[in-house]
UniProtKB/Swiss-Prot annotation:
SUPFAM superfamilies on file: YcgL-like
PANTHER family, per database record: PROTEIN YCGL (PTHR38109:SF1)
Native organism: Shewanella amazonensis (strain ATCC BAA-1098 / SB2B)
Span of domain YcgL: 1-85
Record protein name field: YcgL domain-containing protein Sama_1929
Domain of life where this protein originates: Bacteria
InterPro entries from the UniProt entry: YcgL-like_sf, YcgL_dom
Pfam families tied to this protein: YcgL (PF05166)
UniProt lineage: Bacteria, Pseudomonadati, Pseudomonadota, Gammaproteobacteria, Alteromonadales
Residues that span the membrane, as ranges: none
Length: 92
């Protein structure tokens, strides 16, 4: 299975995986409006991959089969103040 991966023109580190290049027919319109113009990053052979960067490859495959798309959001940002307080042993 080969899928197309697009990055968002509006949201940093946000990617949309679809089963066919330039086929956004299964992606909800509100999501596409929020996503902005999809910019093709790569065509990805999922059947040859065992791992992806931050996405769970089994979840990507499953959502592509069930929903027709997979949306990868950026990882949560670390709260540096909370981390510093934890390092100092200060609890909230």
């Amino acid at each position: 299975m080969i899928c197309a991966v697009y990055k968002s023109s509006r949201k940093q580190e946000t990617y949309l995986f679809v089963p066919k290049r330039d086929d956004f027919s299964q992606v909800p319109e509100p999501l596409l409006q929020m996503f902005g113009t999809p910019l093709l990053v790569m065509l990805l052979p999922l059947d040859r991959k065992e791992k992806l960067g931050i996405a769970d490859i089994d979840k990507v495959r499953s959502e592509l089969a069930q929903k027709g798309y997979y949306l990868q959001l950026p990882p949560p940002k670390d709260n540096l103040l909370t981390q510093h307080r934890r390092d100092l042993g200060i609890e909230d």
